[in-house]
Amino acid sequence: MRKTPESGRITVLRYTERRIPDALAFERALREEEDVWGWEIDDDYVQSVTVSFRDGRFSNCLSYLAYEDGSVIGRIDAVLIPTHFDGSVKAYLDWICVLKSKRHNKVAQKLLSTLSKELKERGVDTLIALTASNDEAQRFYRSIPDSEMHDVGIWISIR
C-alpha cells in the first residue's frame, strides 16, 4: 500500500520511482506559477527520470519531496561527492524548490533538515551549493544556520 501524507500537514518523503508522477505534477505546478524553467516535461524527460532510478550511476543521489494534502509542494535533490583529495565525502545541493504559493512556511527548511539528517548519518559534514541569484533565494540561503557564502560558481560544458 502506498504511504500517503496526512491531510494539512507537511510530510517529507524520499523521492522514489513510484513517486515520479507526484514530482512531475509538482514541476507542472511550478511552471503555472512562473515559467522560467530550462527544460520541458516531455516524454524524453519522463523517460530519463524513470531510467535514472534504475541506473547505478545515480546511487549517490538523495532526493526528497514535501507533501501537503497529498500533493508535492517542495523538493530537494543532492548528490554525495566522495573524493580522494582528502578522503572525505561531501554533498552537493543540486536543487531545492518550493511552490511560490507555499513559500515562507518553513517547507524549504524542513526539506533541508531532512536531507541534513541523512547526510549526517552517512558521515557527510559539508553540503555545497550553487545558489540562485534572486533576492528571495539569497535570503533563504543566508538564513541557514552554520552556513557561510563564499566562492564563485562556474558551469563548464563537457563536450
Predicted regions span which residues?
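Residue-level recognition of the GNAT/N-acetyltransferase active site
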Residues: 81, 99, 132
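A conserved beta-turn-beta hairpin within the catalytic core of GNAT-like acetyltransferases
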Residues: 81-93, 103, 149-150
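A short beta-loop-alpha structural element at the N-terminal edge
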Residues: 10-25
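Conserved active-site alpha-helix within GNAT-family acetyltransferase domains
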Residues: 109, 121, 125, 132-158
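A short helix-loop-beta-strand connector motif used in the catalytic cores of GNAT acetyltransferases and
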Residues: 51-65, 92
